[in-house]
């Protein structure tokens, strides 16, 4: 069984690692090391990758990109080519975006500028989500990003609640505030009812 977990460097940047549980982990050096997983935030232009030369590259997984491995190799591998490759690979491709638009409306055509803008918004959304959820996991002093971290980010920043990922706590029902105008209308209705 394998676990995907996240560790954080001194700058708060998330590093994803994949570990396998083995009954016997022996090799020529005595330990079996699995390559860590890459995340989109590791190679973003906004982060400081001071420790990227000591990380292994690996396939990007769980993001729905359909991309293959970024790089694989030893601990001394150079990541300049893999960093440039992952920055140029969008989270959503233009053909997939066109396919999604056609699912909504078959007659709609997007301009080139609109496609570029939507792809940039998607990339920014995913990068922001990964960065914030990593910070929430770090605040919990955890090495794993959990569903509740993503839920917290979506609920606080976008006021979104994703159905199907319920928590143990019950959310209180928020009643709408009764305005003064509404109270006056109700009083008028009651007064009219009493007349008849």
UniProtKB/Swiss-Prot annotation:
What cellular component GO annotations does this protein have?
A: nucleus; SAGA complex; transcription factor TFIID complex
Tell me the Gene Ontology biological-process terms attached to this UniProt entry.
RNA polymerase II preinitiation complex assembly; transcription initiation at RNA polymerase II promoter
- Which intervals carry biased composition (Gly residues)? 59-71
Q: Does the keyword Nucleus apply?
A: yes
Q: Where is this region: Disordered?
A: 17-97
Give start-end positions of Low complexity composition bias: 48-58, 72-86
Histone-fold domain residues: 93-160
A single Gene Ontology molecular function, please?
protein heterodimerization activity
Q: What is this protein called?
A: Transcription initiation factor TFIID subunit 12
From what organism does this protein derive? Drosophila melanogaster (Fruit fly)
């Amino acid at each position: 069984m394998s676990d995907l977990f996240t560790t954080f460097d001194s700058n708060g940047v998330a590093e994803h690692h994949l570990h396998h549980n083995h009954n016997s982990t022996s090799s020529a050096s005595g330990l079996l090391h699995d390559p860590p997983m890459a995340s989109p935030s590791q190679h973003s232009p906004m982060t400081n990758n001071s420790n990227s030369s000591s990380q292994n590259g690996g396939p990007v997984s769980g993001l729905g990109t359909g991309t293959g491995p970024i790089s694989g190799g030893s601990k001394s591998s150079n990541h300049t080519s893999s960093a440039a490759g992952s920055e140029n690979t969008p989270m959503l491709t233009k053909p997939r975006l066109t396919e999604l638009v056609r699912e909504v409306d078959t007659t709609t055509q997007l301009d080139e500028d609109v496609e570029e803008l939507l792809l940039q918004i998607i990339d920014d959304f995913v990068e922001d989500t990964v960065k914030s959820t990593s910070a929430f996991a770090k605040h919990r002093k955890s090495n794993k990003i959990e569903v509740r971290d993503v839920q917290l980010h979506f609920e606080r920043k976008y006021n979104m609640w994703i159905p199907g990922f319920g928590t143990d706590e019950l959310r209180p029902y928020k009643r709408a505030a009764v305005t003064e105008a509404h109270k006056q209308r109700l009083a008028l209705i009651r007064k009219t009812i009493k007349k008849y």
